[in-house]
A protein has these predicted regions:
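Short helix-adjacent coil turns
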Residues: 147-159
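Short, low-complexity N-terminal intrinsically disordered segments enriched in polar/charged residues
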Residues: 126-150
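Short, flexible, surface-exposed loop segments at domain boundaries
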Residues: 2, 7, 15, 19-20, ...
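Exposed beta-sheet edge and beta->alpha loop/turn motif
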Residues: 63, 185-242
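Short alpha-helix capping/helix-loop boundary micro-motifs
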Residues: 91-97
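A short macromolecule-binding patch
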Residues: 81-91
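Glycine-centered tight beta-turn/hairpin loop motif at sheet-sheet or coil-to-beta transitions
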Residues: 59, 79-81, 220-222
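Short solvent-exposed beta->alpha transition segments
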Residues: 103, 142-143, 159-211
Length: 242
């Protein structure tokens, strides 16, 4: 009787141990499968993150005053004090321009592409319209200012000479008078187009250039140019280097 009980106990214990082994083995297989799936999912996620999205062309807006215009190009003196030359295609929308693309017009330029500094080689102009914000100077004054800025930027002494009224004040610390176009052209180029003068005039923001009684100043500060209203239009009446 006792022997039978002992034998039954041994059988029951063996069955318990066997079932435990099976459960443990299944658990290990499930863990391995789960780890493998997680690893594969992680790899897939890592792959998705590493995919590079190609850069998209940017859209931009620039405000400025047109200082030079032709059928295929226009040069803008922007409200940031930069001079940018844009190419113009036949499909440019100009329906928002009252007087067309012309020197002295304050405009808003909508473009697509990459604008690097003053270079617009990779830019396509989509639309040119009248600017909502307006300069304080008259259109006649803006046309004159644009011609002067271009002559100074290009260091074109001959053109600049013809944008002056004589006798002309040429103040380099000593008050000097220049009597004629020929005398102005005979001046040393380095004396006329100093680095500081070219920088000051070229960075003029025509939207904030103030007019006074009979003219305006071109330049961020000294050195600057005094531009006055004369019987022959707006002309430079003074160069002030100090």
């Amino acid at each position: 009787m006792v022997k039978n009980k002992i034998f039954k106990s041994i059988i029951i214990l063996s069955l318990i141990l066997l079932s435990t082994s099976v459960v443990t083995a299944c658990g290990k297989k499930a863990d391995k499968a789960s780890s493998s799936a997680a690893s594969e999912q992680g790899s897939a996620s890592s792959g998705a993150v590493s995919v590079e999205v190609p850069p998209m062309s940017s859209n931009g807006i620039m405000y400025g005053v047109i200082i030079e215009a032709s059928e295929k190009h226009m040069t803008l003196q922007s409200d940031m004090g930069t001079t940018v030359r844009f190419g113009l295609n036949k499909d440019v929308d100009v329906t928002g321009l009252k007087d067309g693309i012309a020197a002295g017009e304050a405009v808003k330029v909508e473009y697509k592409g990459e604008l690097k500094g003053e270079s617009a080689k990779k830019v396509k102009v989509n639309k040119v319209s009248d600017s909502e914000k307006l300069p304080q100077l008259s259109k006649e004054a803006l046309v004159a200012a644009g011609s002067i800025i271009l002559a100074v930027r290009n260091k074109d002494q001959s053109s600049l000479a013809r944008l002056c009224e004589y006798p002309l004040v040429f103040d380099t610390g000593t008050d000097r008078r220049i009597g004629s176009v020929q005398e102005f052209i005979s001046l040393k180029k380095s004396d006329v187009f100093t680095k500081r003068l070219v920088s000051s005039v070229s960075k003029t923001n025509l939207f904030v250039t103030n007019s006074y009684s009979d003219g305006f100043l071109l330049g961020l500060s000294e050195p600057n140019l005094v531009v006055s209203s004369t019987k022959d239009g707006y002309l430079i009446t003074g160069f002030h280097y100090k």
